[in-house]
Curated annotation (Swiss-Prot):
Pfam families: AA_permease (PF00324). The gene is Slc12a8. This is Solute carrier family 12 member 8. It comes from Rattus norvegicus (Rat). Coiled coil: none annotated. Residues 469-489 are annotated as: Disordered. The keyword Protease does not apply. One of its GO terms (biological process) is cell volume homeostasis.
Length: 707
């Protein structure tokens, strides 16, 4: 039997020989008794495509065109696609820095902005997923009730609750064949979409408002004509939940066989481009073949346009159930990851999992209860704005995460303007530690020796302990050692001495000439390190230009390179090999997308936006008090307000802040100084005393002579 590729959909079953031989029906395992991991295409691609074909596309596209018109409707659909695409590209940019965790959006934001912000946004995202699941179930129940002729609102709620309980049982049991039906479900969605396109020019139904293509009809539907109480932004708030499935692929990072696969990050963007193309086709065709009255009043007008209405309804049912199933799958696992990280101690019981895949049973039950509470609302147009605000807050956090990570990664967060240099021989900010000589109190210090208690004295002691390269006696010997160090700098690791020099910010390129061999050994031993560091800085700057070309092309002072190296080591940001789609990730575009989303939130539902932001602020403060020791994030050294101040204040001369400067006493560059005793030969015992002043306490009895 040939060896199968691990990317195949039935790879796990083929290894067990299930496909090779038939088994009796009573021996077939329907439930997952072992961990099941997804591949790149059968996991990420199919999940993204099924989740983004939601109920809003099938039930509210005609209503959107009937209110906004064809022209403004296409503009609204394009704007929704653009906002979601910017978020997808921002998520790809964060994932390319090494993130791919099991917590989905929570892990992504926590790795950049810290656990406190990640926990806050993660809880908002979980709440939005629960409300979105209720909206999908309500849309499914509306279609079933219309098909059965049931106009009662309680019929819609009863159908929604029954379907929710069925999906809850499937999610808890983990039926294996449900996972393997994803490609089949995706094929049925494609067939239903094709059925709608073919039906738009193969038949007519004037009784229900489907009169076919005509220039007069398209011209009458080109301009907006809103229903009473509707506007552009209310329609936008109802239609935006069509973009809520873009993060489904990122939420599956912990259930992939190969999370670091190079194809994984680009699949969500490919899926969303396909979804955007489908939205535009739906909006244009409905506006070109149906009357405005039918578009605004009949939510199932697309079913009348389809050639075979049953196929369209099948696609609607599949998309509704799959989207709800995706919410019941992703939200509990994010909640489980938050509980496992102990972000909120009160939710620690939700971190336990059962079964081989660590199924979060408690989290699934909790999210199902929240979903059931919103199912009782029973109206899609009421639930859609709630979903919109929560998801837009999440998308703002993702966009800002990539912007902050890019700014912190390029070292522009703390130093937007380089300090002017006084000359080509200006000292580095770490050189004064090497050149200042502390006095030795009373010790017998010969001329030309190193001063006691300095970092160079510590380095000399480490030379004696670690026994590095021996003393250099002549200039030819120094050149020979330099050549040896240059040849071996890429073959061996740093020794302990060089590691200590890095940690104490020692700089070997000092203009002072020390007479002892220890200083010569210091300069020679750190020569190889300085050259390797310069090479690393060159390669790192090239990779930075590759990563964010707009940010890294700004000039930077040479004295800042050393501290930039230290900051990058603290951030511990990983980079993968650059791919062709990385150039599409731009931090400035992400920032503009975040600001645009924030503005739209206030225009759609400003009251609910303020309430959501207030709740988020309270959760943020509570997490800070309950769990103060959370991870700060790789972009913790970036402050948005300091960054804004650095750009806005210099533009106004009257508001220009004075730069703080520290004046250091100049040290003689080419003069050797030594300390000698004022009276040689006397007080020899003072040379053996330790390097600090002593004090003692004398009582009254010791001071008064005895009588």
């Amino acid at each position: 039997m040939a060896q199968r590729s691990p990317q195949e959909l039935f790879h796990e079953a083929a290894q067990q020989g299930v496909l090779a031989r038939s088994q009796p029906w009573w021996k077939i395992q329907l439930f997952m008794w072992e961990p099941v991991l997804f591949g790149t295409w059968d996991g990420v691609f199919t999940s993204c495509m099924i989740n983004i074909f939601g109920v809003v596309l099938f039930l509210r596209t005609g209503w959107l065109v009937g209110n906004t018109g064809v022209l403004l409707g296409l503009l609204l659909v394009s704007f929704v696609i653009l906002v979601a695409l910017i978020t997808v590209l921002s998520g790809i940019g964060v994932a390319e820095h090494g993130w791919m965790g099991s917590g989905g959006v929570y892990s992504m934001i926590s790795s950049v902005l810290g656990g406190q912000m990640g926990g806050t946004v993660g809880l908002l995202y979980v709440f939005g997923q629960c409300v979105a699941g209720a909206m999908y179930l309500t849309g499914f129940a509306e279609s079933i009730s219309d098909l059965l002729g049931l106009g009662n609102i309680w019929a819609v709620r009863g159908i929604s609750v029954a379907v929710l309980l069925a999906l809850l049982g499937i999610n808890l049991a983990g039926v294996k064949w449900i996972i393997r039906l994803q490609l089949l479900l995706l094929s049925l969605l494609a067939v239903s979409t094709l059925d709608f396109v073919v039906g738009s020019f193969t038949h007519l139904d004037p009784e229900h408002g489907f009169i076919g293509y005509s220039p007069e009809l398209l011209q009458s539907n080109i301009l907006p004509e809103y229903s009473p109480g509707e506007s552009f932004f209310t329609v936008f708030g109802v239609f935006f939940p069509a973009a809520t499935g873009v993060m489904a692929g990122f939420n599956m990072g912990g259930d992939l066989r190969e999370p670091a696969d190079q194809h994984t990050p680009r699949l969500p963007s490919s899926c969303w481009v396909s979804r955007g193309f489908s939205n535009i086709i739906f909006a244009f065709l409905l506006g070109a073949v149906c009357t405005r009255e039918a578009l605004r009043s009949d939510f199932l007008i697309a079913e009348k346009v389809s050639l075979v209405g049953f196929l369209f309804l099948l696609g609607l049912y599949i998309s509704s159930l799959a989207s709800c199933m995706g919410g019941l799958y992703g939200a509990p696992r994010i909640l489980q990851c938050i509980a496992q990280d102990k972000v909120i101690p009160a939710l620690a019981f939700l971190g336990n999992g059962k079964g081989p895949n660590k199924t979060p049973v408690a989290a699934i039950c909790l999210t199902s209860l929240v979903t059931m509470a919103f199912v009782l609302v029973g109206q899609v147009n009421v639930l859609a704005p709630v979903v919109t605000i929560n998801f837009m807050l999440t998308y703002i956090a993702v966009d800002y995460s990539y912007f902050a990570l890019s700014m912190a990664h390029c070292g522009l967060a703390q130093s937007p303007e380089p300090m002017p240099r006084q000359g080509p021989d200006a000292l580095h900010c770490s050189e004064h530690l090497l050149q200042d000589k502390a006095p030795s109190y009373g010790s017998d210090t010969p001329a030309g020796s190193l001063s006691e208690g300095t970092l160079l004295e510590f380095t000399k002691d480490m030379d004696q302990l670690l026994q590095p390269i021996g003393g250099l006696e002549s200039q030819p010997r120094s050149r020979e050692v330099n050549q040896v160090l240059k040849s071996q700098k890429h073959k061996c690791k740093k020794d302990a001495k060089q590691t200590l020099q890095d940690s104490f910010l020692l700089d070997a390129e000092s203009p002072l000439s020390f007479s002892m061999g220890a200083s010569e050994r210091l300069s020679v031993a750190s020569c190889g390190e300085q050259e390797s560091y310069q090479n690393q800085q060159t390669s790192r700057s090239e990779s930075h230009d590759h990563l964010v070309p707009d940010l890294c092309t700004q000039p930077r002072a040479n004295g800042e390179d050393f501290f930039l190296k230290c900051r990058l080591q603290e951030q511990q940001v990983q980079r993968r090999p650059s791919a062709f789609y990385v150039c599409m990730c731009n931090p400035w575009v992400s920032l503009l997308g975040a600001l645009a989303s924030l503005l739209i939130m206030f225009v759609i539902q400003w009251l609910y936006t303020l309430a959501s932001m207030g709740v988020a602020a309270l959760v943020y403060l509570y997490i800070g008090q309950a769990s103060p020791g959370l991870y700060l994030g790789s972009a913790s050294n970036f402050s948005f307000f300091q960054w804004m101040k650095s750009f806005l204040v210099p533009s106004c001369r009257s508001l220009r802040s004075t730069r703080e400067q520290i004046i250091l006493a100049p040290s003689p560059a080419k003069v050797d100084m030594a300390m000698t005793q004022a009276y040689p030969g006397q007080w020899q015992t003072s040379a053996t005393r330790e390097r600090y002043h002593r004090s003692s306490f004398l009582s009254r009895e010791q001071l008064m002579p005895p009588y």
